[in-house]
């Protein structure tokens, strides 16, 4: 039980040393992260890692906390990621290009496999509703169209409700999600994330609630397909922060550490 509560305990102890809160509203354009995941169960261990660099061609304004920059991406952006583990490694590229309210989508899961990619076209309505039609091409299995919609309801200058829905052209695979972002007072915020995914063979739901306090700390707890998830975050300053996650899944335990640098 102690190891499950470690992220929360560390954040709570550190809070006693935090200074008077100030709201963290900053602008960033370039987001980079390095992530390590370890899975341990009765039968095997697995180690995985991921490097991500995500660049926006316009500055992104934070919502008040240092890891939230709004629900919708509405500016041209480009992303490169490298993921690897005990049995694989991939180099992926993706991006969106905006021209007025129209935008084009491109995604390649692994640059060494040009037979698997996504191309799409979408439209942004009033900076609040983002709709796109995407074509997923696969070297194994059928190609298919995918429809995606995202909506941001801005409650005030900080609080918002975000909704997303996505499905294939035959409605066999679909997912929905929502995010609530609320400014309580000072530098105290709360976020609630919920989602559900459904396919021909299985379905899963998830939920997470996070609480931000002071300038440097956040804790969270939730469920991922009925499995316990605990999270702690430490914001070193407006450029760097750390995230630690623990997930209990049956006889397996998942540990995740991530370091983010944003400029």
Regions from the PLM with identified roles:
Residues 94-144:
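Hydrophobic alpha-helical segments and helix pairs
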Residues 26-36, 73-82:
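Transmembrane beta-strand segments of Gram-negative outer membrane beta-barrel proteins
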Residues 30, 60-63, 99-106, 127-133, ...:
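Repeated loop/turn-to-beta-strand initiation elements of outer-membrane beta-barrel proteins
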Residues 46-60, 147-149, 230, 234, ...:
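Outer-membrane beta-barrel "beta-signal"
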Residues 128, 140-222:
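Detector for outer-membrane/organellar transmembrane beta-barrel domains
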Residues 1-31, 42-45, 60-72:
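Cleavable N-terminal export/targeting peptides
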Residues 38, 55, 97-99, 123-125, ...:
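Residue-level signature of outer-membrane beta-barrel architecture
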Residues 31-33, 50-52, 92-96, 118-120, ...:
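Membrane-embedded beta-strand positions in outer-membrane beta-barrel channels/transporters
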């Amino acid at each position: 039980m102690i190891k499950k509560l470690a992220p929360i305990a560390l954040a709570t102890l550190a809070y006693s040393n935090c200074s008077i809160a100030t709201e963290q509203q900053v602008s960033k354009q370039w987001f980079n992260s390095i992530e390590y995941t370890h899975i341990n169960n009765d039968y095997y261990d697995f180690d995985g890692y991921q490097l991500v660099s995500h660049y926006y061609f316009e500055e992104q304004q934070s919502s008040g906390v240092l890891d939230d920059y709004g629900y919708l991406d509405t500016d041209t952006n480009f992303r490169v990621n490298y993921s690897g583990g005990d049995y694989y490694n991939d180099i992926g590229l993706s991006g969106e290009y905006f021209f007025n309210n129209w935008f084009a989508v491109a995604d390649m899961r692994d640059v060494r496999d040009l037979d698997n990619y996504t191309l799409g076209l979408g439209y942004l309505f009033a900076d609040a509703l983002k709709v796109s039609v995407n074509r997923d091409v696969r070297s194994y299995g059928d190609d298919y169209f995918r429809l995606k919609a995202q909506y941001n309801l801005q409650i005030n200058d900080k609080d918002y409700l975000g909704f997303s829905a996505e499905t294939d052209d035959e409605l066999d695979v679909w997912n929905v999600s929502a995010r609530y972002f609320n400014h309580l007072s000072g530098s105290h915020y709360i976020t609630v994330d919920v989602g559900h995914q459904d396919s021909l063979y299985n379905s899963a739901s998830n939920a997470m609630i996070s609480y931000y306090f002071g300038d440097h700390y956040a804790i969270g707890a939730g469920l991922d397909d009925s499995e316990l998830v605990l999270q702690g975050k430490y914001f070193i300053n407006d450029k760097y922060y750390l995230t630690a996650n623990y997930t209990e899944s049956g006889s397996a335990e998942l540990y995740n550490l991530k370091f983010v640098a944003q400029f």
